Structure formats: structure tokens, C-alpha cells
């Protein structure tokens, strides 16, 4: 049976709808950085997501080819994630990093092979996809149910909870507003979408 990160790491992928603290371990991702409106069907964001899934499925399906990855195990491709820089409300100015978690057996060597393999087989340039390590640390987290545009209400509850616990949001050049998308927006009504929200924290004392 394929390893499913959502089921094996429920604290990370199936949190409650109430704000809570969590320490997120260091993980490696396939990542694409960009700027622009994520809702633009012809925009940079959509292209980035297609690259990420193309690379992850190249890794997943390597079991059917001649290349052998040491320690390989079959896996369910984890949920799409996004790191968002706080640059105002205009969506065309959003700066983001789109992410898909990599299985632990994917080293830099295996990642570089997958980039070359995907580029050759799919006739598309995958060189924009980065091998990215993110050590998120202490965060406040909450499951948001509903439209992406309604996130501010959930974020306000999260930040208020963090303040009650003696913490403040800690955005920086290396720590960001973080979203994990458990619902396909093309197949799920806005009011039924599930999105995990995370904010990095520091002590306010």
C-alpha cells in the first residue's frame, strides 16, 4: 500500500478547526518561486503547480523504469502547499513559493535525476523546480473551512490565540504565511474547501 503522509502525520495534515501550537519538523520539498495572481488560469502560478506535479509523478513512477532510487517506497503525492510573502492585498503582486513535499528517500542526486528525466520525457523545462529544505519550527496552526477570501477571520483567531500563549507572529525572509491545500479548487465549492493555515511564531516576552 502506498505511504500516505496525510494519514501517517495527522498533526500536520489533519488538524482541528481550532487554533493550536505545533512544532513543524524540517522537511524537503520540490519548490517553484513566482509572483502573480494564483487565480489567473494562464498565469505563472498554474504553470508552477504543473511543474511540481510533473516532477513528483516522475519520482513516483520511477519504480517502472530502469533507474533505481535507494530506499524507494511507493507514496501518495502529498497535498500542494504554498508560502506567501506579505506584500499587500493585490493578488497580481503576490509573491509565493509553491511546494510539494518530497519523500525522505529523495536526495539531491535523485532530485536532479528527476528534473532531467521530466524535462526529457515531458518536453518541458523543469529547471525552475528547486530542492528546498524548510525548517518551520514553532507555529500556530488551524484548519480553515471555506473560501480562500474568508481566511482573514481564521487568521485573526489564530493570531489572538498565539498572543494569549505569549507568542507573536514571526514573518521574516525565511519564515512565511503557510497554506496547505486539502481540496481541489476546481472540484470543490468554495464553502467546502479545506485549507490548513500556519503562521511562524516567536516569544513575545
Region spans (language model):
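A solvent-exposed interaction/effector surface
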Residues: 1-205
Amino acid at each position: 500500500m502506498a505511504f500516505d503522509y496525510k494519514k501517517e502525520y495527522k498533526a500536520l495534515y489533519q488538524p482541528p478547526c481550532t487554533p493550536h501550537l505545533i512544532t513543524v519538523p524540517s522537511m524537503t520539498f520540490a519548490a517553484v518561486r513566482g509572483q502573480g495572481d494564483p487565480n489567473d488560469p494562464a498565469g505563472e502560478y498554474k504553470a508552477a503547480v504543473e511543474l511540481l506535479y510533473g516532477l513528483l509523478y516522475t519520482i513516483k513512477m520511477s519504480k517502472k523504469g530502469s533507474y533505481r532510487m535507494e530506499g524507494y517506497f511507493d507514496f501518495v503525492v502529498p497535498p500542494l502547499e504554498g508560502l506567501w510573502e506579505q506584500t499587500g492585498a493585490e493578488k497580481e503582486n503576490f509573491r509565493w513559493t509553491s511546494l510539494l513535499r518530497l519523500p525522505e528517500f529523495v536526495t539531491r542526486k535523485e532530485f536532479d535525476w528527476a528534473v532531467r528525466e521530466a524535462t526529457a520525457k515531458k518536453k518541458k523545462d523543469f529547471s525552475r523546480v528547486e530542492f528546498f529544505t524548510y525548517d518551520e519550527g514553532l507555529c500556530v496552526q488551524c484548519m480553515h473551512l471555506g473560501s480562500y477570501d474568508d481566511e482573514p477571520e481564521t487568521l485573526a483567531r489564530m493570531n489572538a490565540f498565539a498572543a494569549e500563549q505569549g507568542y507573536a507572529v514571526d514573518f521574516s525572509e525565511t519564515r512565511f504565511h503557510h497554506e496547505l491545500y486539502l481540496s481541489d479548487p476546481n472540484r470543490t465549492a468554495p464553502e467546502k474547501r479545506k485549507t490548513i493555515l500556519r503562521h511562524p511564531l516567536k516569544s513575545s516576552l
